[in-house]
């Protein structure tokens, strides 16, 4: 799939709030003598494409032939966008082009200074006419709304109506609590907070998620209904609710992740990719982006690299793991086992375990430990091979090998929040249960076990 997509160059039109993201990198190592505030010494500045322009950059990085339509002011930021984007921009005199200046110190954002004009544009009719003139040449349209006055109700309704008449998919990254101006679009990509505001729901937990996502589809006549759920992935409603789980390994900065999601979805729909597969690829793109700092674009090569996991990076000693966990404010899930011949039952079990928290740690019995528990003929695979196989799964965050007969010492050392065991432990004592906040028992898939697989192989000889 990635190989096919990386060779495509679909023509995609993007309209919306084009901005400039400026990063001012500073040294903040002293306090001002004038007041109890930090002194920021500027080291360098980095001007980047932001808002709809970042979606443009993502689409271009993916290989699309992108064309931008928008309205900018007669200012330096407007000139920067015109110089760096292929497209046509209407100039509204006196209007401020959105400019966000992020003050960065020690890889942390400490302040943001915004220059912008959020009033509705005066050039609605001209923008609609320009769209009508260009639209027939494109495979998909993206409306990137940051509530800066470009995508007014009049503009949105006219653009969606025209594209729909030509059977061209329209994808919208919405803003605000009133989604009615986007009615008839192919899909919207609100995050959880935006969806809650539009739906007037208190939460989107449990059954409310399906009710809410279905209501969005029906109320706004969408082809597909999508809600991005941050670390929980992407929820999709076509004929039923499906969840494409998130795949981020490390999160440094969520800036621009939504732009990457809609860019990948647009690229995929322009090439006829099935919608759930498109959501899975969008998740992978977001995972790449949140591992970087600032508004950045993503390419198919980076997505390919993300899928090629460096197994050894996820295999840690308990000491390394404890240091890493101290740096994260995450819900830690722990399970353990021999995992000698990894099978379908193991995969489903670990996938379910991951859903219970943020970080899944698998405690793996060492070769010596497996021999004690299973006999001299085991393990079939070495501890390193078994650790690599487990680390290959995106839902496993870390693997730690232990020599003891039970994981009690390891659990005491790491102090996870949730301890997961198989449902066969229902009437048994779970080692480490008194150390953790919660024990969860997960049903195994029927008919799968390492012992049975070994017996089957022996019988065939």
Curated annotation (Swiss-Prot):
Enumerate the residue ranges of region (Ribokinase): 1-312
Which pathway?
Nucleotide-sugar biosynthesis; ADP-L-glycero-beta-D-manno-heptose biosynthesis; ADP-L-glycero-beta-D-manno-heptose from D-glycero-beta-D-manno-heptose 7-phosphate: step 1/4; Nucleotide-sugar biosynthesis; ADP-L-glycero-beta-D-manno-heptose biosynthesis; ADP-L-glycero-beta-D-manno-heptose from D-glycero-beta-D-manno-heptose 7-phosphate: step 3/4
Q: What is this protein called?
A: Bifunctional protein HldE
- Gene Ontology BP annotations: ADP-L-glycero-beta-D-manno-heptose biosynthetic process
Name the catalytic site residues: 259
Q: Where is this region: Cytidylyltransferase?
A: 334-461
- State which Enzyme Commission number(s) the record gives: 2.7.1.167, 2.7.7.70
Main enzyme class: transferase
For this protein, the record's PANTHER family field holds:
BIFUNCTIONAL PROTEIN HLDE
Keyword annotations for this protein, in alphabetical order, are: ATP-binding, Carbohydrate metabolism, Kinase, Multifunctional enzyme, Nucleotide-binding, Nucleotidyltransferase, Transferase
- Coiled coil location: none
GO molecular function annotations of the record: ATP binding; heptose 7-phosphate kinase activity; heptose-1-phosphate adenylyltransferase activity; phosphotransferase activity, alcohol group as acceptor
The free-text function statement in the UniProt record for this protein reads: Catalyzes the ADP transfer from ATP to D-glycero-beta-D-manno-heptose 1-phosphate, yielding ADP-D-glycero-beta-D-manno-heptose.
Oligomeric state and interaction partners are given as: Homodimer.
Q: Does the keyword Cell inner membrane apply?
A: no
For binding ATP, which residues are annotated in this chain's numbering?
A: 191-194
Q: Record's InterPro entries?
A: Bifunc_HldE, Cyt_trans-like, PfkB_dom, RfaE_dom_I, RfaE_dom_II, Ribokinase-like, Rossmann-like_a/b/a_fold
Family in the record: In the N-terminal section; belongs to the carbohydrate kinase PfkB family. In the C-terminal section; belongs to the cytidylyltransferase family.
């Amino acid at each position: 799939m990635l190989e096919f997509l990386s060779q495509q160059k679909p023509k995609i039109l993007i309209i919306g709030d084009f901005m400039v993201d400026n990063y001012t990198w500073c040294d903040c190592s002293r306090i001002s003598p004038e007041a109890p505030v930090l002194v920021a010494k500027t080291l360098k500045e980095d001007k980047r494409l932001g808002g709809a322009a970042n979606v443009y950059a993502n689409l271009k990085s993916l290989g699309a032939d992108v064309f931008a339509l928008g309205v900018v002011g007669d200012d330096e930021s407007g000139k920067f966008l015109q110089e760096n984007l292929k497209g046509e921009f209407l100039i509204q005199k006196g209007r401020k082009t959105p400019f966000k200046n992020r003050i960065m110190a020690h890889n942390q954002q400490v302040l943001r200074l915004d220059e912008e004009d959020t009033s509705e544009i005066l050039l609605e009719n001209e923008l609609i006419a320009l769209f009508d003139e260009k639209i027939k040449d494109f495979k998909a349209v993206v409306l990137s709304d940051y509530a800066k006055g470009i995508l007014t109700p009049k503009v949105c309704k006219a653009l969606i109506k025209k594209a729909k008449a030509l059977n061209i998919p329209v994808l919208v990254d919405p803003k605000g609590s009133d989604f009615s101006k986007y009615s008839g679009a192919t899909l919207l990509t609100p995050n959880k907070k935006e969806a809650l505001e539009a739906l007037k729901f208190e939460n989107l937990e449990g059954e409310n998620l399906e009710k809410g996502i279905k209501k969005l589809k029906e109320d706004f006549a969408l082809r597909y209904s999508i809600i991005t759920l941050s670390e929980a992935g992407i929820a999709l409603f076509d004929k039923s609710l499906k969840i494409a789980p998130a795949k981020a390994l490390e999160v440094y900065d969520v800036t621009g992740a939504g732009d990457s999601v809609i860019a990948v979805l647009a690229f995929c729909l322009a090439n006829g990719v099935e919608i759930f597969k498109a959501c899975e690829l969008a998740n992978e793109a977001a995972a790449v982006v949140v591992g970087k700092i600032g508004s950045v674009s993503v390419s198919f090569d980076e997505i390919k690299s993300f899928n090629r996991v460096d197994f050894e990076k996820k295999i840690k000693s308990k000491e390394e793991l404890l240091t890493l966990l101290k740096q994260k404010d995450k819900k830690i899930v722990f399970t353990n086992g021999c995992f000698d011949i990894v099978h379908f039952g193991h995969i489903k079990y670990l996938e379910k375990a991951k859903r219970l928290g943020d970080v899944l740690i698998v405690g793996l019995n060492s070769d010596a430990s497996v021999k004690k528990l299973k006999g001299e003929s085991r393990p079939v695979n070495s501890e390193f091979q078994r650790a690599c196989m487990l680390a290959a799964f995106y839902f496993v965050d870390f693997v730690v090998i232990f020599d003891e007969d039970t994981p009690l010492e390891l659990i005491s050392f790491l102090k996870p929040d949730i301890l997961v065991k198989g449902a066969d432990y229902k009437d048994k004592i779970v080692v480490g249960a008194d150390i953790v906040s919660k024990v969860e028992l997960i049903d195994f898939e029927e008919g799968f076990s390492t012992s049975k697989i070994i017996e089957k192989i022996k019988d065939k000889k």
